[in-house]
């Protein structure tokens, strides 16, 4: 069993939906038995959540006593209300889980939702879990990528964000040719795990991808050049020209239902909501 895959799951903020999601998800019969699952959190609090859900008549949940739990007895006065306590605990759960995964070959990490505001009010100044992961693993070149397999066709849908948890007004200043090239490298490498010579699309930043500088100049100033430079470095890769963001995900939406045979294998979104809105609607 030691060499079997290990999945480490954090409970996230205990006043949020994380514990409930875990108890429901791990009741599924579809999870392979050969996978070792370890929950990082507070066992007493997880049992309390289980009993509360059962009192509501919810039956399709797993008893925490049947789970392997890394029991961190971090003081949280009230797990029913979001507070600095729940924010601090969720941060420490993730820190501990990261160390477990770093020391465990053939392992993966699943994070439950946290409250970014409560992290900061508890003294942990990170804009999200991604940023803590990047720092903890000494990996500055990371990406937030969303992948899902269509239940209708088996086709895999991939979207990577060039920028993540920053105000939208800062996006044009955060983007540059080097950032776009590094994110294209990550996206292509990931998509290539599932398909040889994957097709990659890049969404424009401005409406209609700037309309040649009329609706914004970032595309003309550096985004088009970044795509051109990446193509030169990767001549065999299938990277499209810049696509208007309002139509960039249309073929993906059709492919999810099996109505399109030639969707992109990966899409690079230039900011958080540009990518997350279509991803959540489609999947």
What are these regions (language model features)?
Residues 1-283:
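Anion-binding alpha/beta catalytic cores of soluble intermediary-metabolism enzymes, centered on
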